[in-house]
Amino acid sequence: MSQTLTANQPAPGPLRALPRYPSLYQVNTRVWLTELSRTLGKRATLDDIPNAELDRWQTLGFDFIWLLSVWQTGPAAQRISRENPHWRSEFQATLLDLQEDDIPGSGFAITGYTVHKNLGGDAALARLRQRLAQRDLRLMLDFVPNHMAPDHPWVQSHADYFVAGTEEDLQRAPQNYTRVALPDGERIVAYGRDPYFSGWPDTLQLNYANPAAQAALIGELTRIATQCDGLRCDMAMLVLPEVFQRTWGLRSQPFWPQATAAIRAQFPDFCLLAEAYWDLEWTLQQQGFDYAYDKRLYDRLHAQAARPIREHLSAGLEFQDHLARFLENHDEPRAATTFSPEVHPAAAIITFLAPGLRFFHQGQLEGKRKRISPHLGRGPDEPIDTRIQAFYLRLLELLQQPLVRDGRWQLLPCLSAWEGNWTSDCFVAFAWDDPRGERLVVVVNYAPHASQCNVRLPWDLSAAKHWRFTDWLGDDLYDRAADSLSEHGWYVDLAPWQCGAYLLTQLD
C-alpha cells in the first residue's frame, strides 16, 4: 500500500452508482484500532486497517462505511470524561478492568476537524479512503453541528460563536452553564445540550443566532466534504430555528438549507445523514438531507405491537425512502440485549427489508451485548453468538440482491383467516418486485403467540396454476394454487415471532 498520498487526496472514481436502497456499516474507529494495536504490538493507525477487512465489508454488501470519532479531541474534554462520576460508573460497568487510558474522552467533543494524530492524521484517512473506493465503498464521517469542545480554538478566538450566559443563568441552571477564561476576562458560556436534558459538560454550545458562526460552520462543512463521501450529522434537529429558540430563547436563520446547498454545489452526490428525533425527520429531509434516523420504527419494534409498525410503514415512499433503519447504534443498547433471541430476527427482517438506508453497527452481526460509550477507547471482550451471526450473514446475502436494492416495495394487507380470528392484526407483511419479474413476500408474526391470516398478494398470478414460496432465510417451502391465492390470499399460520422472506416462482 502506498504511503505517499496526502490529505484531501481525491478518491479514485467514479464509484459504482448507489442503489436506491443502500447499506451502511458503522465502525467504532478508536475501539477497533485499540484491538488492532493489541494484535500488532504497536499503536495502530488508519493505515493498519487490513485490506482483508475492507474486502469483507465489500463482500457483505455495504455501500457506506461510517468511521465514528476520527476527529481531533483535546485534554479538556478528556479530563471531564475521566472525572464525571456518573459517566465513570457507566464506563466501569462496561469495562470491569477500566484504566485511565481507556477514556480518551467523547469523540463528539471536537477541538478541530482534522483527523486525530493518534489515528494517523488527514493523510492516513486519505489513504484509507482510496482503499475503500477501490472496493466501491464510500466513506462517511461525523459532523457535530451543535457544540464544540471547551478547548476548541474558536472559544478563544471567536467567543461570540458560542451561546453566552449570565450570572443569573449560572445560578439558576449550573448544569447548563460554566465559566470560561478568555483573553479579555472570564465569560459565562452554555454547555451544549438539547431542550430535554442537562448540558453536556464536555462541550460548549454554538450560537446559531450569530450569522458569522453559521458561515464559519458552513466553511468547516465544505472543507470536511473534500475528505469523505458523506457525513452523519449529530443531533441535526437541534439547530433547526424552532428547536434552537425553544432551547435557548434565541432567534436564528435556517442553517441546513444553505449548508446542504453549499456542499451539493461542490459535491452533487455527497450523502448527508441526519440523526433526528421528535418527528422532525421530514423537516430535515426537506432541508437537504438524504436520510434521517428512523427512531420511531425502532421504538415501535421495541414495544412489540404489530399495528403501530404497519401504520408507520404505510407512509409514502417519498418519506420512507429517506429514512435510516436501524436496530442499534452507538447511542442505543445492543440489539441482542434489547430484543430476545426469538424477537431479534423478526425485528431485523422488518427493519432491514423495509425501504430506506439499511444501517448496521459494528458488533451487531456477531450478537455483541455490551454498548460501548463514545467516551471509551476500548471495548470488552465478548463471545460471538453464532446463531445471530448466521442469521445476519444470510440476511445480508438477501440484501445484496437487486430485487431489494432497486426493486419496488409495498405494504400488504393481512386479512382475517376466519371470522372472529383477530390474530391477523399481529402480522407485518410486505412485498418486493422488479421489472425482471422477481417477487418476494416478507411475512412476520410480530407477537408472542401463534397467529393466522390471509396475505393479499398484489400481483396477477394467472401465468401459472401453482406457485412455490421458498424462504430465503430458512428452510420453509410452500406450494399454493394460483386460484386460491387470487381468491383468498396466501394463508399463513406462524408460530410466535416466526418470520420469513419468500421468493415466488412458477411451478406449472
What is the predicted role of each segment?
Residues 2-508:
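Active-site and adjacent substrate-binding regions of carbohydrate-active enzymes
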